[in-house]
Amino acid sequence: MASTKERENFVYVAKLAEQAERYEEMVEAMKNVANLNVELTVEERNLLSVGYKNVVGARRASWRILSSIEQKEEAKGNDVSVKRIKEYRLKVESELSNICSDIMTVIDEYLIPSSSSGEPSVFFYKMKGDYYRYLAEFKSGDERKEAADHSMKAYQLASTTAEAELASTHPIRLGLALNFSVFYYEILNSPERACHLAKQAFDEAISELDTLSEESYKDSTLIMQLLRDNLTLWTSDIPEDGEEQKVDSARADGGDDA
């Protein structure tokens, strides 16, 4: 069993790595903490999340750029360029798959078993939903469906616990609603369901705004603003009665997430 000092050292290294923007090393340091089979503190959870979000975020951005260039070259009929771009895109997809697989293992084998119910449980099931959603962004066919199904189940589990145990203004519950609604919009191509979920979360939080603690006020109101921004963006995609629904399933960035 690692000593408290070793645990503190891993956390300190993670903080240093974050400051130096060396996110792969930040992730490794926090994986060392997770592997201790201990319940993570709020600070440790956030360090782990920030590390992985930056590691995966860089690849997601690369994938979007490459996909856009690939489409433009295809439209021009530049087959040689398309072949090169596709090879490069597949390399990025392989990296994305490995990162997502890595965090799933950490969540399933260490984090969820070591966590109490309530806030930590919501946090990690939300995280699981997020990383399966990231897989569904670039997978196709059966692999995409499988990733989407896993994402849906994780978000639903997180939502059930959040609604039972967290206030409607809690930043983790709001962040979950934000990301789950993005899942409906981007992955399931359902702007109606996305808007319903986002609006419900926003309205419930507004009605309880006076109960918001000072420490979480900034985080909660920021996420509420993102929910409102997405609602504004998505409402235009909801078809009028009798009008054919037109949603671009390959949209590069359908809304903000937490």
From Swiss-Prot:
Region called Disordered, residue ranges: 237-258
Taxonomic source organism: Glycine max (Soybean)
Entry superkingdom: Eukaryota
Annotated protein name in UniProt: 14-3-3-like protein C
Record-annotated disulphide pairs: none
Matches recorded under Gene3D superfamilies: 14-3-3 domain
Family matches, as PROSITE patterns: 1433_1 (PS00796), 1433_2 (PS00797)
Gene Ontology cellular component list: cytoplasm
Classification lineage: Eukaryota, Viridiplantae, Streptophyta, Embryophyta, Tracheophyta
Annotated Basic and acidic residues bias: 244-258
One of the GO biological process terms: signal transduction
Family per similarity comment: Belongs to the 14-3-3 family.
Pfam families linked to this entry: 14-3-3 (PF00244)
